[in-house]
Design a protein with these regions (language model features):
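Intrinsic disorder in cytosolic terminal tails and internal cytosolic loops
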Residues: 187-210
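Helix-to-loop junctions at the C-terminal end of transmembrane segments
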Residues: 58-75, 161-162
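A late C-terminal transmembrane helix in Major Facilitator Superfamily
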Residues: 128, 132-163
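Juxtamembrane intracellular "pre-TM" segments in multi-pass secondary transporters
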Residues: 1-12
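A membrane-interface helix-boundary motif in multi-pass transporters
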Residues: 155-179
């Protein structure tokens, strides 16, 4: 209840619900795309582990640097944009056809963006917590962030692919990420990010955007 007494709390909750829609939809279909394009299980494993894993680790490292250098708000906004735009790489792969370089680029970019977001967005969610109720509030925030994803299944994504095709589907997932990005930007401009953070936020995260 303490969270909902903060200014802008309902908009923050709406952002938590919306911010992963595009990313979740896209992630449900990567294996289906790779199978339909003719990649073998061994090829998928090589790209996913050999490139995706390391790209994710690099993204985590860069995310930490961005958070420290440009602050919470701008680093979160940048990570949201990167995660949304990363879906375009799979639209390009689907349009290009089977390509080793295309596969490497798409998986690398997606995992790199996810690594950055894994640092900055989690840090933002942590900053929303009151130190008196950190465990309970973070658990509720994490649960809220996954609610929409529970309604988005492989069947849902598969139906959209059948209707639109892969290229248009990944363009759609990029558009689906836009409401979360726009909402966070509007909250930044209105000062609601600062107003909604809890006592777990640091002095750096409480500074207004430059």
């Amino acid at each position: 209840l303490e969270f909902f007494r903060r200014r802008g709390a309902m908009l923050v909750l709406l952002f938590i619900l919306l911010h992963k829609i595009g990313d979740t939809l896209a992630n449900l279909t990567f294996r289906l795309l790779f199978d339909d394009m003719g990649y073998s299980n061994d090829e998928i494993a090589i790209y996913d582990i050999g490139i995706g894993f390391w790209a994710y680790l690099i993204g985590i490292f860069i995310g930490g640097i961005l958070y420290a250098r440009i602050g919470m708000k701008r680093s979160v906004l940048l990570s949201l944009i990167l995660m949304g735009v990363s879906n375009l790489s799979f639209a390009a792969l689907a349009a290009l056809g089977k390509s080793n370089w295309g596969m490497a680029g798409a998986i690398g970019f997606e995992n790199f963006a996810s690594g950055i977001g894994g640092v900055t967005v989690v840090a933002y969610f942590s900053a929303l917590c009151d130190l008196r109720f950190t465990a309970a509030q973070y658990a509720l925030i994490s649960a809220a962030a996954s609610i929409v994803g529970r309604f988005l299944t492989g069947t849902t994504a598969g139906g959209l692919i059948e209707q639109f095709g892969y290229v248009d589907f990944y363009l759609f997932t990029t558009l689906a990420a836009m409401p979360g990005i726009a909402l966070f930007w509007l909250m930044m401009r209105a000062g609601l990010i600062d107003a909604s953070v809890g006592t777990a936020a640091t002095d750096r995260t409480a500074q207004p955007p430059e």
